[in-house]
C-alpha cells in the first residue's frame, strides 16, 4: 500500500476510531496543543456527514504524543499542498441544507450557499476525499479490515493495564462490558498471564 491512506490508518491505530469517524475528522476537531480529539461526526459511504453511530460515540479523548506530532506534520504538508495546487486544490464542505451532503469544489469556486467548510484530515494531496471502499479494499489486500485497528487498540490498552471503563469511553461504547466481551476476553497475552498466575498458585 502506498502512503495515500496512511493518515486514516494512523488515526485508527492510535485512537481506535471507526473508519467513518476517522474519515469525518476535521482539523477543527483536534487540539494540537493539548492533544484532545473530539469525535462529533462520521462520514458515510454515500458521501454524507452524519452524527456518530450512537449517543456515546460522540466523545472526546486525548491522543498520544506520537500521533499529535504526526498530525502537526501532516497539517503543514497539507498547507504546502494547498499552495502547490493553487486554485485547483479541492475544498470540502457540508451542505447543511441538503441532508448534510458532502460537496467538493476547487478552491477557485466560492463556497455555495448553505454550506459549511469541513477541513478533513484524511484527504489526498489534491484535497480530494478518500473513497470508503477503495480504502477498505486496500486494507483487505493486506489481510486487514478497518475494525482490525479498533480491536488492536482496545486489546493493547487493556493488556497494558488500562481500565475497561476508560477504554470503553475512548471507543465510544455505552458499557465497559461490551469492550471486554468484544476485545479483551481472549487475547494471547491475557491467556499467558492466566497460565502464569495459575502456575504461581500451584507452586506455593
Predicted features, each with a name:
Residues 34, 47-48, 52-67, 73-81, ...:
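C-terminal secondary-structure termini that scaffold catalytic or DNA-interacting sites
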Residues 63, 122, 139, 154-157, ...:
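Hydrophobic, well-ordered secondary-structure elements that form the walls
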Residues 43, 171-196:
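Catalytic-site neighborhood detector that most strongly recognizes the C-terminal catalytic loop/helix
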Residues 103-123:
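Intrinsically disordered, low-complexity acidic Ser/Thr-rich regulatory segments
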Residues 10, 14-21, 134, 138-141, ...:
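C-terminal catalytic core of tyrosine-transesterase DNA break-rejoin enzymes
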Residues 1-25, 32-33, 57, 66-69, ...:
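Basic, Lys/Arg- and aromatic-enriched nucleic-acid-binding interface segment
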Residues 29-36, 143, 162-182:
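Short, polar N-cap/turn motifs at the start of nucleic acid-interacting alpha helices
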Residues 2, 49-58, 122-130, 142-148, ...:
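Short, contiguous acidic/charged loop-to-helix segments that flank catalytic cores in large enzymes
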Amino acid at each position: 500500500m502506498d502512503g495515500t491512506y496512511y493518515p486514516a490508518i494512523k488515526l485508527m491505530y492510535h485512537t481506535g476510531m471507526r473508519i467513518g469517524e476517522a474519515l469525518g475528522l476535521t482539523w477543527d476537531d483536534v487540539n494540537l496543543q493539548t492533544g484532545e480529539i473530539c469525535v462529533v461526526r462520521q462520514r458515510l459511504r454515500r458521501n454524507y456527514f452524519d452524527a456518530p453511530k450512537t449517543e456515546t460515540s460522540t466523545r472526546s479523548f486525548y491522543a498520544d504524543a506520537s500521533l499529535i506530532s504526526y498530525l502537526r506534520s501532516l497539517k503543514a504538508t497539507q498547507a504546502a499542498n494547498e499552495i502547490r495546487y493553487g486554485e485547483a486544490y479541492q475544498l470540502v464542505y457540508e451542505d447543511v441544507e441538503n441532508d448534510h451532503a458532502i460537496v467538493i469544489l476547487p478552491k477557485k469556486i466560492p463556497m455555495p450557499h448553505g454550506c459549511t467548510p469541513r477541513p478533513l484530515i484524511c484527504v489526498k494531496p489534491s484535497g480530494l476525499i478518500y473513497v470508503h471502499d477503495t480504502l477498505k479494499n486496500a486494507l483487505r489486500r493486506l489481510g486487514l479490515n478497518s475494525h482490525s485497528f479498533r480491536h488492536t487498540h482496545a486489546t493493547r490498552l487493556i493488556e497494558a493495564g488500562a481500565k475497561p471503563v476508560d477504554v470503553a469511553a475512548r471507543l465510544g461504547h455505552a458499557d465497559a462490558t461490551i469492550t471486554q466481551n468484544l476485545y479483551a476476553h481472549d487475547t494471547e497475552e491475557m491467556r499467558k498471564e492466566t497460565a502464569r498466575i495459575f502456575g504461581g498458585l500451584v507452586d506455593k
